[in-house]
């Protein structure tokens, strides 16, 4: 090490006081190793079951799992009622902070029970029954959580659609799920201004022939003007506000579907990931208690993710509430009205556990430490990272600046498909390594394998860098139960690559070090990870080609220090199209309009042609080399290797 390089620690053991009082002890690993199914049965029995399960796991129909067979429970009862019945009704369930300063609401568990019961009665009055689907297209407001729990209470599947998605994205999800009801708001606040939301909902519904949606339930959030369809559109405050606050929950089978959540797929069509009740809630509750070490009597937990993403489902709704924890929900952006907002919220509510994405951490780093340093963040006792691998520099900055150099930091790896966290340090046990998600949780089994499914040896310093595939070799309770309406796609997407081994293929590259720590390196397929959001290349390419001037498009993810990956597009224009100075910006805007602002390409390069194999396949791997200014890889299968001279000249 040179004298100019400051020495930094390679691992960070937990403080003695934290370790002494941690929920998870080292014995958990031994217990799970000795009898994995008995271990999961013990975790499941922390929930309230109306009918006990008779079998922990039925894997006879692999890769379709059945967990806690024969058991019956109600997810909403486990998240709300049982805490009230245990005498904790006065405990705050949700501190909600709106984006406009001073806009706040506090709901105790008793308040939440009344609101969820009213919403459940209202949905029943609208004719919804168990097994129906409800689309939820809302900003991060209490009604979003209430709507989710009301659906869970009735055995209705909710399909939450991120409020930043466009009408086209909403339309595709409504059609695929055949949703019977849409819950939305008049608008939402973004960067201090109200923006319409119902208008996009109206546009989506208008584009659906023989639309399955019978009613649209509208929350008044901003007061902005909007179109109204008499008979179809109903005000939330009228319908839910007048409903009875008394409702008796019905138990459902452990495998009863709980929700659909759509995620990007390499074919372009979003995949409806299906999760069920008992297994999902078991692992959700378990990981919340062990990874985040929650103490319901004293902790205030804040997961910054929107509920439109799986992190918002699992650690913004079900995880905290099934453990009886107090949580913070914040509607807006981190820089509204200024860059102090997140730190003001931590200080205001005494947040003790803060869970966010590396993109936001890197943004805070750019802003400078003087902003967090001007706030009292001493309430924080644990930090978490989610959504993408975190680089060691950001990890250390996060711990040192936000955590005061004293808090454990849990870097969690998981996916929409896994339902809950799978790989993470346990904060009272692990000596965490910056940049590593560490080891699979007790009860979880993962491997790093080569193309043949054989385990790779640990990577050692100075050795050739070998990246393997991250696979899961044993079923887990919160695993997806399929892709809605497409079992063949489920098998092909996750199980076909290593079908002879029975491994779940996560789609991420990873390596393992001599200590057994796993280092996840990111996506290896054609799904890009932009600020923790998975965007498929096919979706973006489709949006580009829809433009009248574009003949062909190819999109790749490239390294970006702020968002992990940024989208770089290469387009071939139609011969009769006259490009102009604003062509690239016009295409960027079009992608943002069709998909989401998140999917807006950072770079758009107009090129004369795209590199293709002799079979006509676009070689994105080589385009990625160009975008990253690297030397080209193997070009032997290219139809015309000279194409890159023209591409580089155009770039």
Curated annotation (Swiss-Prot):
Recorded catalytic activity of this chain's protein: acetate + ATP + CoA = acetyl-CoA + AMP + diphosphate
Signal peptide start and end residues: none
Binding site for Mg(2+): 545, 547, 550
GO biological process: acetyl-CoA biosynthetic process; acetyl-CoA biosynthetic process from acetate
Cofactor(s) named in the record: Mg(2+); Ca(2+); Mn(2+); Ni(2+)
The enzyme's E.C. designation: 6.2.1.1
Cofactor note: Magnesium, but can also use calcium, manganese, nickel or zinc ions.
Superkingdom in the source lineage: Bacteria
Alphabetical UniProt keywords: Acetylation, ATP-binding, Ligase, Magnesium, Metal-binding, Nucleotide-binding
Sites where the protein binds ATP: 387-389, 411-416, 508, 523, 534
One GO MF term attached to the UniProt entry: acetate-CoA ligase activity
Temperature dependence: Optimum temperature is 37 degrees Celsius. It lost its activity rapidly below 25 degrees Celsius or above 45 degrees Celsius.
Entries under CDD domains matching the protein: ACS (cd05966)
UniProt PTM comment: Acetylated on Lys-617 by Pat in the presence of acetyl-CoA as an acetyl donor and ATP. Acetylation results in the inactivation of the enzyme. Deacetylation by the SIR2-homolog deacetylase CobB is required to activate the enzyme.
Binding site for CoA: 190-193, 311, 531
One cellular component term from this protein's GO annotations in UniProt: cytosol
EC class of the enzyme, as a word: ligase
Further remark: Could be also autoacetylated on Lys-617 in the presence of acetate as an acetyl donor and ATP. Autoacetylation is effectively inhibited by CoA. If CoA is not available or the concentration of CoA is low in vivo, the enzyme can transfer acetyl group from AcAMP to itself, resulting in autoacetylation and inactivation. When CoA is available, the acetyl group is donated to CoA forming AcCoA.
Record's function text: Catalyzes the conversion of acetate into acetyl-CoA (AcCoA), an essential intermediate at the junction of anabolic and catabolic pathways. AcsA undergoes a two-step reaction. In the first half reaction, AcsA combines acetate with ATP to form acetyl-adenylate (AcAMP) intermediate. In the second half reaction, it can then transfer the acetyl group from AcAMP to the sulfhydryl group of CoA, forming the product AcCoA. M.tuberculosis may use AcsA for both acetate and propionate assimilation.
Homology family: Belongs to the ATP-dependent AMP-binding enzyme family.
PANTHER family in the cross-refs: ACETYL-COENZYME A SYNTHETASE, ACETYL-COENZYME A SYNTHETASE 1
Protein's name in the database: Acetyl-coenzyme A synthetase
């Amino acid at each position: 090490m040179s004298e100019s390089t400051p020495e930094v620690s390679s691992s960070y053991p937990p403080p003695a006081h934290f370790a002494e009082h941690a929920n998870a002890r080292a014995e958990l690993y031994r217990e799970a190793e000795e009898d994995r199914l008995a271990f999961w049965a013990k975790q499941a029995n922390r929930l309230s079951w109306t009918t006990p399960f008779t079998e922990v796991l039925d894997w006879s129909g692999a890769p379709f799992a059945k967990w806690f067979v024969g058991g019956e429970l109600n997810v909403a009862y486990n998240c709300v009622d049982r805490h009230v019945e245990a005498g904790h009704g006065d405990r705050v369930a949700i501190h909600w902070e709106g984006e406009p300063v001073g806009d706040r609401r506090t709901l105790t568990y008793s308040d939440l029970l009344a609101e969820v019961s009213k919403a459940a009665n209202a949905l029943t009055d609208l004719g919804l029954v168990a097994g129906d689907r409800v689309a939820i297209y809302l900003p991060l407001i209490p009604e979003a959580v209430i709507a989710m729990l009301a659906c869970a209470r009735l055995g209705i599947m909710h399909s939450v659609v991120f409020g930043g998605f466009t009408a086209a994205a909403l339309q595709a999800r409504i059609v695929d799920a055949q949703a019977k009801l849409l819950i939305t708001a008049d608008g939402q606040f973004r960067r201090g201004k109200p923006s319409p939301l119902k208008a996009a909902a109206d546009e989506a519904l208008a584009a659906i022939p023989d639309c399955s949606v019978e009613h649209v339930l509208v929350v008044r959030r901003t007061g902005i003007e909007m179109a109204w369809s008499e008979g179809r559109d109903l005000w939330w405050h009228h319908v839910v506000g007048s409903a009875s606050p008394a409702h008796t929950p019905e138990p459902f089978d452990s495998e009863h579907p709980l929700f659909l959540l759509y995620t990007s797929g390499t074919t372009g069509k979003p995949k409806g990931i299906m999760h069920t009740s008992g297994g999902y809630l078991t692992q959700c509750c378990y990981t919340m208690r062990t990874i985040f070490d929650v103490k319901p009597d004293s902790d205030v937990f804040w997961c910054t993710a929107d509920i439109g993403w799986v992190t918002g489902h699992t650690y913004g709704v079900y995880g905290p509430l099934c453990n009886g924890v107090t949580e913070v929900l914040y509607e807006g952006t981190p820089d509204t009205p200024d860059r102090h907002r997140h730190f003001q919220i931590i200080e205001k509510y005494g947040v003790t556990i803060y869970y966010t994405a590396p993109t936001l951490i890197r943004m805070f780093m750019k802003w400078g430490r003087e902003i967090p340093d001007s706030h009292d963040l001493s309430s924080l006792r644990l930090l978490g990272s989610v959504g993408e691998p975190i680089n060691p520099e950001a990890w250390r900055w996060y711990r040192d600046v936000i955590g005061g150099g004293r808090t454990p930091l849990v870097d969690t790896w998981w996916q929409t498909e896994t339902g809950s966290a799978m790989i993470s340090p346990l904060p009272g046990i692990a000596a965490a390594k910056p940049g590593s998600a560490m080891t699979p949780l007790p009860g979880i089994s993962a491997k790093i394998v080569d193309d043949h499914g054989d385990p790779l040896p640990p990577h050692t310093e100075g050795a050739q860098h070998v990246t393997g595939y991250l696979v899961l070799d044993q079923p887990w309770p919160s695993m997806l139960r399929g892709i809605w309406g497409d079992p063949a796609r489920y098998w092909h997407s996750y199980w076909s690559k290593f079908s002879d081994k029975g491994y779940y293929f996560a789609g991420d590259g990873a390596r393992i070090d001599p200590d057994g720590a796993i280092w996840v390196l990111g996506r290896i397929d054609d799904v890009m990870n932009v600020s923790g959001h998975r965007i498929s290349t096919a979706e973006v390419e489709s949006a580009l080609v829809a433009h009248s001037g574009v003949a062909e498009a190819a999109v790749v993810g490239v390294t970006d220090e702020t968002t992990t990956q940024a989208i770089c597009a290469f387009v071939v224009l139609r011969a009769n199209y006259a490009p102009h100075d604003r062509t690239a910006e016009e295409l960027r805007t079009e992608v943002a309009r069709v998909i989401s602002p998140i999917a807006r390409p950072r770079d758009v390069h107009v090129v004369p042609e795209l590199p293709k194999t002799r079979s006509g396949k676009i070689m994105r791997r080589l385009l990625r080399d160009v975008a990253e200014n690297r030397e080209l890889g193997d070009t032997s299968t290219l139809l015309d290797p000279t194409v890159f001279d023209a591409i580089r000249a155009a770039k």
